[in-house]
């Protein structure tokens, strides 16, 4: 195994070598993630569930028990709820125009922190240019862009994983006999483990642990692990994660352990959960899409990675990627964001291949010409498909084409065409620069303009707007029948209830100021129950939309009791 000092790596331009690089990557991330952060309504289902549970914590003052209305939500640890509650409080509370966005702030900060940490790891062990290119590539990744805009766990988990892997790298990369790690560094490693556990359970342990096993086998020595001070370090991780675990176990009478481990984790390991099953290899098949636009450069980097497989920095990245990737592929339940914690290492390898001055075309960086061209063609097809999806989604609802969606699609296609043309000519660095800069425009138009402008998917905000227009002075309790998505709770509040058409009719009979929202297969039951109770309902308006969580169109009508 060879060991190259990071100072020997290609350095790149002056701004890449200087601390200015961190400011540039931060600004790049903000330019990518801010569009749409406030404009996209609450997304079903996970984001809305997380945010609603956090809202209820703030309403009740109970920051131990996790609930979605009256139902205990014990599948995930508490960390992200605390972060969302703190962010919303610091932001001055919810925004009445779009309540969800303050709950997204921890995801934004997690994504920004992850790309900055990726830059730091790359600069330290692969060189300034590789670190900069890798961090920019990770930032522009389609999957991270989606997670940075959603009030979920995955973007902040990514930060915890990257921080832990930075500590692991500092312990393993130096040769035997190196000076002990500074106290702050090994404490940071174990703190990242503890925070990662508190955010999403054992994922951070799996990624760091499997990487540590591979690195130990690679070096045939265990002594490097002592540099992480495992015994006091484990106590630090436990001090972060254990108090809440004990509190919720007592509060739930052990239900958290049985539901999170037995009901959630074991179910995912044993079989496909919630119709999210896929065979092994699914993540590999998804990679060209969800790592876009960087997937072009990651795939073209494969020969470079093979040639440099004995480089310690490359071994570190491969240990980060391969064992956990195989583990994720082996689990029947598959969702695209599961492999996000491995993407920083992929981005760093792609950045290192780009920065290698000896790795130029026409040799295609080690690919035979037909192989490199096949990769470029695949990448072009993905770009064309992404633009087509934006255009196909644009007219959802009224059938009219969307100018914003069309602009976003053409921006994606322009980035695809320009990047492919330069890559085909062998100018990979120029292609990367164009693609990454162009992604700010293309993804900004997509997330900042095209998606918020859609009508059909955003059913709950339109219901809320219709009700306000008809009853601006206020209304009584709201019951929704035929549409049970949690985004409705974000729109109408914790007191809104889901039920049957008969429940909706009874509510109108009991409360003259109540509102019933009825649609789907509950309309007939609602009308039958009204007739039986001799109650007359007055329609306030109708909202037609597309329930993307179920993949079907729906029509909902708002009612109040007729005077």
How would you describe each model-predicted region?
Residues 2-364, 547-555:
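Membrane-integral, polyisoprenol-dependent glycosyltransferases
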Residues 2-10, 187-191, 269, 304-563:
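Membrane-embedded architecture of ER/inner-membrane glycosylation machinery
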């Amino acid at each position: 195994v060879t060991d190259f000092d990071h100072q020997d790596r290609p350095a790149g331009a002056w701004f890449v070598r200087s601390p200015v690089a961190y400011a540039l990557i931060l600004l790049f991330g903000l330019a990518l993630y801010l569009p749409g952060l406030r404009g996209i309504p609450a997304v079903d289902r996970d984001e809305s569930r997380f945010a609603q549970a956090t809202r209820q914590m703030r309403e009740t003052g109970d920051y131990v028990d996790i609930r979605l209305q009256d139902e205990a939500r014990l599948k995930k640890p508490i960390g992200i709820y605390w972060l969302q509650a703190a962010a919303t409080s610091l932001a001055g509370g919810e925004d009445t125009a779009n309540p969800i966005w303050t709950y997204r702030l921890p995801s934004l900060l997690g994504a920004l922190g992850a790309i900055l940490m990726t830059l730091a790891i790359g600069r330290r062990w692969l060189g300034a240019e590789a670190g900069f290119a890798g961090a920019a590539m990770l930032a522009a990744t389609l999957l991270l862009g989606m997670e940075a805009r959603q009030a979920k766990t995955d973007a902040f988990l990514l930060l915890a994983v990257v921080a832990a892997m930075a500590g692991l790298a500092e312990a393993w990369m130096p040769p035997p006999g190196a000076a002990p790690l500074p106290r702050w560094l090994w404490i940071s490693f174990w703190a990242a483990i503890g925070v990662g556990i508190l955010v999403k359970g054992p994922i951070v342990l799996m990624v760091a642990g499997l990487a540590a096993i591979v690195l130990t086998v690679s070096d045939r020595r265990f002594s490097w692990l002592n540099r992480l001070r495992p015994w006091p370090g484990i106590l630090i991780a436990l001090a972060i994660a254990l108090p809440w675990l004990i509190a919720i176990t007592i509060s739930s009478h052990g239900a958290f352990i049985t539901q999170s481990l037995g009901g959630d984790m074991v179910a995912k390991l044993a079989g496909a959960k919630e119709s999210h099953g896929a065979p092994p290899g699914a993540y590999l098949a998804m990679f060209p899409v969800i790592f876009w636009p960087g997937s072009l450069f990651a795939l073209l980097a494969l020969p470079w990675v093979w040639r440099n497989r004995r480089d310690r920095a490359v071994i570190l990245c491969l240990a980060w990627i391969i064992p956990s990737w195989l583990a994720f592929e082996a689990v029947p339940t598959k969702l695209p964001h599961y492999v996000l914690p491995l993407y920083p290492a992929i981005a760093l390898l792609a950045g290192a291949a780009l920065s290698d001055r000896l790795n130029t075309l026409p040799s295609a960086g080690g690919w035979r010409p037909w192989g490199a061209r096949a990769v470029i063609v695949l990448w072009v097809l993905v770009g064309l498909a992404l633009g087509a999806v934006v255009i196909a989604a644009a007219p959802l609802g009224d059938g009219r084409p969307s100018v914003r969606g069309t602009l976003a699609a053409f921006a994606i296609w322009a980035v695809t065409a320009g990047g492919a043309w330069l890559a085909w000519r062998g100018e990979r660095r120029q292609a990367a620069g164009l693609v990454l800069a162009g992604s700010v425009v293309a993804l900004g138009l997509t997330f900042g303009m095209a998606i918020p402008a859609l009508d059909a998917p955003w059913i709950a905000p339109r219901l809320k707007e219709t009700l306000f227009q008809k009853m601006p002075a206020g209304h009584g309790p709201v019951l929704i029948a035929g549409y049970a998505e949690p985004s409705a709770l974000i729109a109408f509040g914790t007191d809104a209830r889901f039920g049957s058409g008969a429940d909706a009719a009874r509510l109108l009979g009991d409360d003259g100021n109540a509102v019933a929202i009825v649609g789907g297969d509950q309309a007939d039951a609602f009308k039958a129950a009204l007739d039986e109770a001799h109650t007359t309902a007055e329609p306030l308006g109708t909202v037609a939309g597309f329930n993307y969580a179920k993949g079907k169109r729906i029509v909902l009508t708002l009612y109040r009791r007729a005077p």
